């Protein structure tokens, strides 16, 4: 009715700016449910590749779903390449992964993409756990992420707990966080933004994040909002990625992402919601 059908071989594909590889839920705001609207609000074409599919996050009384079958997961990635959708790719954003097998498949695919498109930025949020929950990923994930995924990243956005486990070092003070972060930097891994950093140094109403490169370290403080929805790290890494792709310097991008998360947390508190409330205009929160 609206056009001729066919294989589309002669037509141009949708060129993706970002491939976001994360969790997906039917109900709630975590993983790609957060990353997709945040990145798209900045005018980016995004391919959302699910790693797990859950009804909701595990802190509810009921939970259904699980990790995607490995042949499905690998197929999603390889078919993006097969469709020609990656010719203008700018970034790969990685979040929650379902098991070590997914880490291995994803790492091989990223290597293939980088061989063809070496300028693509790889930003990894190495989701492992947090101080209040402990490790909440599958057995073997810490080792798989450390050995296979981290070496491919240009930048990392761990929380304080994850930094400690990945580096094998204490990360209680600012100095310890900087040392632990730099132990993971390489010629390829250029920077790290550590969220919920150095908790032993927080005031009653503030928290810290640290921006660490080989030659510099900056501390940013932000308000401590008395709510704890899931998905704040996913929101932070998506906003950070969007700002970096706009050409914003790392420290400014991290500040903008931090402000954005604080805005979301304030909205969540006002709504008295268990779920993270996304800002109504995801592009406006930027520290002047």
Swiss-Prot record:
Q: State a single Gene Ontology molecular function.
A: pyridoxal kinase activity
* Residues annotated for substrate binding in this entry: 23, 59, 234
The UniProt record lists the keyword Transmembrane helix: no
Q: Which InterPro entries match?
A: PdxK, PM/HMP-P_kinase-1, PyrdxlKinase, Ribokinase-like
Task: Note whether ATP-binding occurs among the keywords.
Answer: yes
- Cellular component terms (Gene Ontology): cytosol
UniProt binding sites for Mg(2+): 136, 162
This protein's assembly is summarised as: Homodimer.
By sequence similarity, the record places it as follows: Belongs to the pyridoxine kinase family. PdxK subfamily.
The protein's name in its UniProt record: Pyridoxine/pyridoxal/pyridoxamine kinase
